[in-house]
Design a protein with these regions (language model features):
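Alpha-helical substrate-binding/gating segment
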Residues: 170, 196-200
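N-terminal Rossmann-like NAD(P)+-binding domain of SDR-like oxidoreductases, especially those catalyzing
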Residues: 1-184
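Glycine/proline-rich active-site loop of Rossmann-fold NAD(P)-dependent oxidoreductases
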Residues: 159, 184-197
């Protein structure tokens, strides 16, 4: 049975929810998060306080772009699966701070993919976004729809990481699954999301 799973973005809403589920079911989880202040960091610390209550949880706070720390952390943990959920989120913010997105989302994800290949993990799961569908007018969206017309820097970085992942899967036969999330909601959710704002 697979026991060791590396989760990036473990202080984020989806990362926290996944890590908690895995820990509750007996897995060993190592979380990796830079604790970005894109929204209230107190919420991220509160989520992590719950995770730290599990003896099978360990954590590294750093940037995905810090290849040396990332390499050492993953190599020492020796995960069978990597779930890459960390990213600089926010479509509007990407217009104001595009370089942040290029660095975090593209360079950070490339580092994860390269390490997954180097360590020959059983599976790499990467979070993408519904924003890659861009100007696509087909409704409802389908996995096979064209994704060449992104409308924001955020979406473009997500599409770029999908392309890098596809190339590694093709060249090295690295098992990769990409998840295109739409609006995700629930307990401990992000305060900047529409549903959270509506309830307020």
């Amino acid at each position: 049975m697979i026991k060791k799973i590396f989760v990036t973005g473990s202080a984020g809403f989806i990362g926290f929810s996944l890590a908690k589920f895995l820990l509750d079911n007996g897995y060993h989880v190592h979380g990796y998060d830079c604790m970005s202040d894109y929204y209230d960091v107190r919420l991220k610390h509160a989520r992590h306080k719950i995770l730290k209550g599990h003896e099978n949880f360990s954590f590294t706070e750093d940037m995905l772009e810090n290849q040396e720390v990332l390499d050492k952390t993953i190599t020492n943990f020796k995960p069978e699966i990597i779930v890459h959920l960390a990213a600089q989120a926010g479509v509007r913010y990407s217009i104001e701070q595009p370089r942040v997105y290029l660095s975090s989302n593209i360079t950070g994800t490339f580092n994860i993919i390269e390490l997954a290949h180097k360590l020959k993990v059983n599976h790499l799961i990467i979070a993408s976004s519904s924003s890659v569908y861009g100007a696509n007018k087909n409704m409802p969206y389908h996995e096979t729809d064209k994704t060449q017309t992104q409308l924001s820097v955020y979406a473009a970085t997500k599409k770029a990481t999908e392309s890098i992942a596809h190339s590694y899967s093709n060249i090295w036969k690295l098992p990769i699954t990409i998840l295109r999330f739409f609006t995700v909601y629930g307990p401990w959710g992000r305060p900047d999301m529409a549903l959270f704002k509506f309830t307020k």
